[in-house]
Amino acid sequence: MEKKYDVIVVGAGINGIACAAYLAKSGLKTLVLEKRNECAPFALTEDIFGAGIPVDTHAGVCFLPMSPVWGDLELDKFGFDLIVASAPAGTVWEKENLVWYINPQKTAEAISKFSQKDSKTFLEIVSKIMPDIPEILQEAVFSPAEEEKEDYLWSLGKYLGFPPEEFKTMNCFEILDLLYESERVKTASFGACDIAVFGDPAEKGEGAVMTALAFTIVIGVPAGGMHTLPHSLVRCFKYYGGTLLLNAPVERVERKEGGGFRVFLSEDAPYPQKEFESKCVVMHTSPPISLKILGDLAKQDDDFYKKAKDWDMTGHCAFTSYFLLKDLRWESESWNPDIAKVPFPLRAYDSWEHAKISVQKMKNEEVLDVIGDIAEMYNLSAVDPSRAKSGYRVLVFEMEYPINLRRYGGKQKWDDRSFVDIIHNGHIELLSRLIKNFKENLVASMYFTPIDNWRRNPSAIYGHELGGDVSGPQWYTGRIYPRSKIQGLYFSNGIWPASLTHLGSGYVAATCVAEDLGVKQKQEWWRWKPYEYFLKKLPELKKI
């Protein structure tokens, strides 16, 4: 086993592997070390019901269409196959729904059932923002967070009709109140902003940016399951000479005299070689875990050390319920039957007033009062035949809850099944309102709590899926900088953007490493802008 590398990446989440694949393709000798026995613990696809149905047990929404990574790494050649739904998302209520189509004109028609004025407003915004989506995503998402770029974020207000000095003091609630008249349109739009995870929609500034960036989101469905994304990334990484070691927990990272690093595996790692050397190290573990691994070395970067020791990972922790069903028909199909074709339906409050109350209750950590109020649902069999078998299908219901549970006895209550059953049963009761004969068609159900997810992904403290809260003091420049003040040390977890399936954090970290080592400008293939590869591929993609 070789000892010396150009770059060592600690952690094989999807963004860690994406970063490593870029660097390996750039000709850098790259090693990835992963504690677990498989990569990408939050991009798993499993047959959890033993029914032969692949279920995405965490990430279900694939944001890769908006990413440059798809094109740069040519993931199609490595097995990645994306399905594009004509109606990828939609918000469901008991008797109504609002479907978001890939064709803006059709979305406007759906909005017009609630408000002709709002339909016109939506089209006006889309017509202004669509030509600039590649630039917006490149500057606001696929670039390192920098104080000088904050003015660019505030300039996004022009697409919604607000000058920068006003936009930076607005939140999502205020903007949607000023843009739209229909409560349903406001509520559905707020849900879309919230799911995008570019900040807290209720906070000034970041909520405004979330509202603008929601218009840039493009999603798809990986055929066969989300696991095909990390599989294609690993194949790409290995094709370009990368080395991946699983069951390889990193104990510590030390600086070498004269430059470079030593990376040590724990004593119980099943490898005779426990030490590796590299010019650069990329930490793809959450900031508190990185802080522990770096030890005293972390103190040499005062910005990272100050942030990491107080890093908040308590606010965005998924509780996910899974339902094996004989049939799935929405109560609102009579309003618009296309909701049956939507792979990513959204539950977003009963009313606009309910949204305002629920958001505050969530901040108050009144968990039992907000059960099922705002949630992502995955009905992937609507577009992917492999997600159904013998007439059975799986519906996933994922909601992020605050983790502390101080009102209910503390975090240990997540291991009290009598308590968490209340949340799961709350999801069932809600779905019984939204889906015809839900209980009669329910064959089996199960769930993962935030603590269950933490056990499955040791870096995701409390089951936090984003490498730390993306709001308040941890928003944009408040996140970890990808370039450490320690020469040769980089971060791809806990940075901007959050670690999602657009692979933005891996892209940003790889860009920083490649630029600093002087290899990026030599890579002619490293050229795609966000969203553009998707537009090129669109004519040949499978569409449903």
Model region roles, listed by residue range:
Residues 251-388:
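Mid-domain catalytic core of redox enzymes
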Residues 3-138, 468:
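N-terminal glycine-rich phosphate/pyrophosphate-binding loop and immediately adjacent elements
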Residues 373, 382-425:
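Glycine-rich, aromatic-lined ligand/substrate-binding cores of catalytic
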Residues 328, 366-368, 415-451:
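Flavin-binding catalytic cores
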Residues 130-240, 247, 456, 460-470:
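Active-site/ligand-binding neighborhood in enzyme catalytic cores
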